[in-house]
Amino acid sequence: MGADLREINALSGAEAYEFARMGQALMNAITRFPAPVYAAIEGHCMGGGLDLALSCSYRITGPSAVFGHRGAALGLMTGWGGTQRLPRLVGKANALEMFVAAERITAAEALRIGLVDAIVEDPVGEAVRRIQNVGSPRRH
């Protein structure tokens, strides 16, 4: 999940600003949701998709998932709050490395730096199981 870069490149300055504001409003609504919100991640979680996952209370991933914030390599940065949320979650040094190097990291590395909470074979099933057993404190 993320933005279609062809669409982004076609936006005027005012349209790009509005797109960023709408994305920020959505991510903030997810962050403020009164119950835990789980991101079940499989495949690629990049850019805006990573911003979405960062807005959630918990991130559960499959073993083959790949994460990254490659905007710097593409000459852009998402405006959906990832640049603020990622350092809070993984620390300034790890976030800076992800932003500047713009390299993809594995699920195992994401777990090591605290980007994800668990690696499981069935992220969706695990998220549903955890939601059904809500009672853990919320984390951001």
Annotate each predicted stretch with a short phrase.
Residues 4, 52-53, 110:
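Hydrophobic/aromatic residues within transmembrane alpha-helices
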Residues 21, 81, 105:
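Conserved active-site and cofactor/substrate-binding residues in soluble primary-metabolism enzymes
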Residues 1-27, 45, 73-75:
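Glycine- (often His-adjacent) and acidic-residue-rich active-site loop
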Residues 47, 102-109:
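Acidic, divalent-metal-coordinating active-site segment for phosphoryl/phosphodiester hydrolysis
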Residues 60-65, 107-140:
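C-terminal long alpha-helix characteristic of the crotonase
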Residues 1, 10, 100, 112, ...:
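Phosphate-coordinating loops and pocket residues in cytosolic domains that bind phosphorylated ligands
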Residues 26, 30-32, 40, 46-99, ...:
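CoA-thioester-processing core
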